[in-house]
From Swiss-Prot:
Cofactor remark from the record: Binds 1 zinc ion.
InterPro entries: DNA_gyrase_inhibitor_YacG, Znf_NHR/GATA
Keywords linked to the UniProt accession: Metal-binding, Zinc
Cofactor(s) essential for the protein: Zn(2+)
Gene Ontology BP terms: regulation of DNA-templated transcription
Protein name in UniProt: DNA gyrase inhibitor YacG
Family designation: Belongs to the DNA gyrase inhibitor YacG family.
Keyword check for Zinc: yes
One of the record's GO molecular function terms: zinc ion binding
Function: Inhibits all the catalytic activities of DNA gyrase by preventing its interaction with DNA. Acts by binding directly to the C-terminal domain of GyrB, which probably disrupts DNA binding by the gyrase.
Any matching Pfam family: YacG
Organism name: Haemophilus influenzae (strain ATCC 51907 / DSM 11121 / KW20 / Rd)
Disulfide bond positions: none
Length: 64
């Protein structure tokens, strides 16, 4: 059986269907992680993240 560390508390989590919150060990750790994303403490790196700030980018798709 494969075990992975919980991304929040590092507790060992078995990677099986019965592990309801995998890769998290509990609902609490799952919600802590969600809160970090919602508070923008975590982000996926991207070269195009600032496209909205670029005046040269067309916004034809936006509703006016």
């Amino acid at each position: 059986m494969i075990e992975v560390p919980c991304p929040i508390c590092q507790k060992s989590v078995p990677w099986i269907n019965e592990s309801t919150f995998r890769p998290f060990c509990s609902k609490r750790c799952q919600l802590i992680d969600l809160g970090e994303w919602a508070a923008e403490e975590k982000a996926i790196p991207s070269d195009t993240a600032d496209f909205a700030m670029d005046p040269n980018v067309s916004d034809e798709w936006s509703i006016k």
